[in-house]
Structure formats: C-alpha cells, structure tokens
Amino acid sequence: MGNPLFAKKPMSLLLAESAEAGTHSLKRTLGPFQLTALGVGAVIGAGIFVLSGLGAHYAGPGLMLSFVLSGMGCAFAALCYAEFAAMIPLAGSAYTYAYATLGELIAWIIGWDLTLEYAMGASTVSSGWSNHFIELLNMFHLRMPLWLAYDHWTALSTAEKEVARQIAISSDSTLVPGTQAFLDKVSSIMATPSPDLLQRAHELMNAPRIFGMEIGFNLPAFIIALVITAILVVGIKESARFNSAIVVMKVSVVLFVIGLGSRYVSVANWGSDWHTFAPMGFSGIGAGAAYIFFAYIGFDAVSTTAQEAKNPQRDLPIGIIASLLVCTVLYIAVAGVLTGMVHWQDVNIEAPVARAFMDRGLSTASHIITLGALAGLTSVMLVMLLGQTRVLYSMANDGLLPKKFFAAVHPKYRTPYKNTILVGLLAAIVGSITPIDDIGRMVNIGTLLAFVIVCIAVMVLRHTNPGQARPFRTPWVPVVPILGILFNGYMMYKLGWVNWARLIIWLVIGLVIYFAYSRHHSRVSNPDRVEIPNP
C-alpha cells in the first residue's frame, strides 16, 4: 500500500462525483455568459481603478506592457486551469486538480493556500470598497469618524496625514493644496513626526479605547462583506444575476473611461522613444507587472463553480479564457488612456483614474468612475467569497473538513450556507481590522503558489493518465505549463522574504490541522470509514 499522504483521488471517482445528481447536489444554473461574467466580476476591480496608479510610477507609459506581461503569466495558468475544469468539472478548483494528480497532502496544502486567495482576497477588497465608499460620502460633504472608517493603523496614519496638511497650510500661506510643493511639504512633516503632530492626530481620531488602545474598526468593510454573504446564502442563481448586473455596469464605466478619456490623451505623454516610454527600462515594466498582478486575481474562481455549470466541459474553458481576454484588453486600454491623459510622474496613486478626470475638470465623470469602482469591487468580493465556500465544500465532501458543517446544503436555497456564513463573517472581521496592504501581499503569494501547482499538475496528469478524455487540451505541453511555472514563480520571488515567511507560517498552521484531523477522516486514505449522511 502506498503512502496515504500522497494518496490520489482516482479519476473514476472524480468523474462519478461529477455525474452524480443527488438530493443534496448543487443546482446547475450557470451558462457561458454567466461564467464569463463571474470571471470578469472577479478580475475587474482594484487593479483597474487603484493599482494602475502605483504601476505607472514603476513602468511609466510602459504600464501597458506591464499589463501584457502580467496577463501572459495568468494566461499560461488559465490554459492549464481550463484543461482541468473541462476534464474534472467539480467544485474545488486547484484543490481538486491537485488531489487527482499530486496526492492528498499537496491537495490539502493548496486548499488551505486558496484561503489566502479567496477569503483574504475578499477581505482586501472589502477594505478597498470602503475607501471608495468614504470618497463617495466626501463628494456629498459627509464624513464618518475616522475610527469607524478605517482599521486602527490606517485611521492613525490618515489622521497624521490630515494634521500634516493642516500644519503645512498654517506654516506657509503660499502653498496651494494639491501642488507638488504642497505634497512635498506634507511628506516632509510626516517623515519627522513631532509630539504635536502625534497628539493632534490622536485627537482627530477621537476614538474610544479598549485596554488603553484606540479602537479602529472599518465599519463599511464589515457591512459590505456581510451583505455579500447574505446574497450568496440566498442562492447561486440569484448571486449570478446580481453579479452579471454589476459586471455590465462596471464594464460600461470602463468603456466610458476609454471613450471619454481618449479625447483628452496627449501622445506626448507616452514619450517619443523607448527611454521616455519606459523611463526605468524593462526592469521597471517587470516591477510594474509584479505589483499589478493583483489586478488579475480571480479568473480561476470560475472553475470553483463547476458543479453549478449547465455544461461544464464546454462552458468552463470559455468562461476562464474569455474573462481573462476581456480583462486584459480593457486593462491595456485604460493604462493607455491614463498615461496619455496625465504624465506618468503626476499620476495619482490612491485613485488614479478618477483623479485624472478630476484634474481635467471632468468632475461628473470622476463621480461616475467612483461609482464604477464601487460596483467593480462589489462583484470581486462576491466571486471571491463564492470561490472560497465551494473549495471548502469540496474539501468537506472528501472528509478533510467536518462534512456536517462545511458541506451542509440549505434545504431551500441549495447552497452551502453554514460555511458561507462562517467565511463571510471571517472576511468581514479581517477586512475591518487589518491594513489593506498587509492582506494584499499575502493574497498575491498564495495565488501565485496555486497557479504554479496547477501548471505542474497538468504535466503530471498528461504522464499518468495520457488516455483520459480531455474536452479541452492545454496547447503546447510542456512548454505552456513550464512558462507558467517560471513566470509565476519569478513573481513569487519578487514578493520578498517577509511574504515568504508569512506564507510558510500559514502553511504550517494548515499542516497542523491536516495531521490532527484531516488525514484521519479522509475518504481516500480511509475508504472503509463509515460516514454519517448529511441531514
């Protein structure tokens, strides 16, 4: 008998589970358009409305090439995902694929790792959604207390920046807010914080205290995560309709940005040669690509809905590849408009697209873009939470998590409601108390690891099951998977040792859970184990 740690889930069992249509199975209601919309909904959001600003400061007008490079890395992984999604149409995404090819331990690791992409990704996006919601309130001259608008650390940093602005204005009446000289003065004040600055910042927060520490709780992030959770509990069909409506809205806003913004593009801003187009050279373009990778996270969530697709063998590859193509084209176009409207050195980092239009005097357009960003981030949260709950559902059905809880299907809505509520609550809490930057970097490295494992798994399964029917085949194997491994592995390397350390700690926690519970309850490693059916 082989090592149970590397026991593989037989393809025959996977295909039998795919064909099974029992009382407690998920409803098959999603077609190719809805699956593509889910993918677009997961991808378009923080990247196009927020991260393009910082990417421009690395790559200059070459940001367009940064999106191409980042998209290529995702495309290699997407082609591998598409082969698995068509061949193994089960909820679970990379987790299920790893179980069939690399064994149970690796499958557990990737399932645990996917929590970084989906649940923590939803937390990241809920915090970003909150920032745009607060910006929307500001447009109507409404203010939230800082301690209810941000987590503690972000609230204090925001208060310090606001006080620094006040000090800059009072110290030099010639400074004009918004100019580079003003911003430099504010940065100088914050770089050498004085007792007066810190005291006034704490007064501005005006937050209640627990055990002597000021409270910081991002209330909008908490509420929006719970609202999305409630929508997911009601049902996948209703969730898909809600998501499709939002996707139509935000794609319309993106097309609006491209159409109107192109009228204000100055070709001179793109530069006249390679050195002005890519002021930091190819290394700057590569750095921009690594940073904006978050912009592409989410397309793989389409594969987690395999058991809810009407014709998964045909529709899942369409949904995965079409959503990635649509998003890449839109990203490149927006990057071109952004760096054409504003010189790359003047691109705003916090709200680059909206600010570019505001600086042109197009305030109404800027407001529309802010609303589009809110819609975009809402749909990203929906798809990420959806993906997480379906991965947990698959792991529970395999015995790696308690089935009575994580695979419990609502008798009316036919959704895994218990694990949906748990995941939504955890995402809401993390998003409301944790700085967005810290979660975002963890999401990046976790997602890249999943991509690398899927690329490896395609090559393994081609060797171990060469005769298996494949409705969609990844082209040019092993070239495409190897390129996916190299490209995504390089971006993992660029994320630095701190994030590697965080990833290792997270995986160690997962391994403790596996050896304490999962390996003893696994259906594959313990085929004679008697299961108690779900009520």
Identify the meaning behind each predicted range.
Residues 130, 213-264, 320-321, 440-453, ...:
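Membrane-interface loop-to-helix entry segments
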